[in-house]
Amino acid sequence: MQRPKVDDDLTLATDFGKTEAFVVEVLDNPATEEGVLLKVMTRGPFEQGQQVWIVDRDGSKVGANVENVSEQTIDNEVTLSTVLPA
């Protein structure tokens, strides 16, 4: 999986099914050497600490942790932390 860019579409697999998201910000995660923080806009009942999967176009999955959820009208701004494979 390549490092996402702003405005990329992502598919997230969660406890409540699959949902679409789009990337609004990509940052290096200072807590982990190769970690990435992704701020995405998406819909669904996300909670801090929740585990989700980012599903790549080829069907491969990368685990991510919900770091923060900020409700914005219908959509939520969700911050995900992950380590992308090289």
Predicted regions, residues:
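Beta-strand/loop-dominated core regions that host nucleotide or nucleotide-derived cofactor-binding catalytic loops
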Residues: M1-A86
